[in-house]
Amino acid sequence: MYLWFFFVTIKKRFAGGFLMKSKKNIILIGMPGAGKSTIGVLLAKSLLMDFADTDLLIQRKHSAALCEIIAAKGIDEFLQIENDVICASEFYNCVVATGGSAVYGEEAMAKLGSEGTVVYLKVGPDELEKRINNIHTRGIAMKEGTSIAQLYEERAPLYEKYADITVDCAALTPEECVDAISDMIK
């Protein structure tokens, strides 16, 4: 656990120990490109939990890629769809990778926060620029002309608001992130 000390911040501690003891799920939030889906799959395997990706749930429900949904319905309607899909979903003993824009949905985040430990996978805008090479086809809910740095500045306070644990993933491999999260929730 001490190895991850400089990369992990715990915002809240529950009586009787770390966060996972009283909650059933692990909820991953963060910017597109932070590694939520990759780390989520690895974390679920290591903890013998199920895995869900809310972006995939949205795509399955609407039979379209995220970028197609955003193009057809607009950002505001997409955000409502995302909020509604999360609120209607049932997760138990599950690692949940959310879309980067899930933090705009107050109802969704209240539900997720009440049902799981929320982990913010923090990666700064410079590293995100390196990781995201398909910004227009990826299905990122952002206004035309907005840069990744601007989107980060807009969303970072929301990620911090909802996070129980923050893991700075910029300098860590996915496996190291999994180890850091696992150590903190035990």
Describe these PLM feature segments.
Residues 31:
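P-loop (Walker A) phosphate-binding loop of NTP-binding proteins
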Residues 28:
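Hydrophobic anchor at the beta1->P-loop junction of P-loop NTPases
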Residues 39:
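Hydrophobic positions on the alpha1 helix immediately C-terminal to the Walker A/P-loop
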Residues 20-22, 42, 46, 117, ...:
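NTP-dependent small-molecule kinase module
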Residues 54-102, 106-111:
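ATP-dependent small-molecule kinase phosphotransfer cores
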Residues 36:
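Conserved lysine of the Walker
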